[in-house]
Amino acid sequence: MKRLKEQLIETYNALNILLHEEETENKVTTATKLIVDTLKENHPFLICGNGGSASDSMHIAGELVGRFLKERKALNVICLSSNPAVITAWANDYSYEDIFARQVEAYGKKGGVLLGISTSGNSKNVIKAFEMAKSLNVKTIALTGKGGGKLSEVADILIDVPSNHTPRIQELHIMLYHYICERIEEILS
């Protein structure tokens, strides 16, 4: 059995790599600016993911529609992973692969942005959402594990963290999106 110390060292090592990657910092800064510009114009900031990434999507939306660290007005953020009626109706009648693309079609518009979270970067329904976003001139940001998988081919901005191990990827994701939420509030407050 892995000891807590070993697991913390794994996380520390992944974080240390991330800490020294200037390219990741530049991508996060660019993504944050894109999201801020979108929200300044009250265009929709859409977020999607499956499983733990769905939880992350809801977490981000909760922080930005509600508040993270500062009192401010609500922001136009929609989590595409959190409406079970829409998701199950579309998945049952059509295809699970299209559950996010259908919602992007409904809520996305030029000037908006879609954040797709996928540890592998290969979630078919997130990829299809990105394809729909492209057709609507909605910018896309992918938050993934190392390499970005197939999302790297369709994302406007790829933020891939330096790990292939799902728990470490998720730990790094939460650090990055908390940073993004904090910057958004700083700028828009």
Residue ranges and their predicted role:
Residues P44-C48:
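Short glycine-rich phosphate-binding loop at a beta-alpha junction
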Residues H20-E41:
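A short, well-structured juxtamembrane/interface segment
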Residues S53, M58-S189:
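Glycine-rich phosphate-binding loops that contact phosphosugars or nucleotide phosphates
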Residues I35, G49, L64:
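Conserved hydrophobic/aromatic pocket- or pore-lining residues that grip, position, or stack substrates
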Residues M1-E23:
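Generic N-terminal amphipathic, Lys/Arg-enriched alpha-helix
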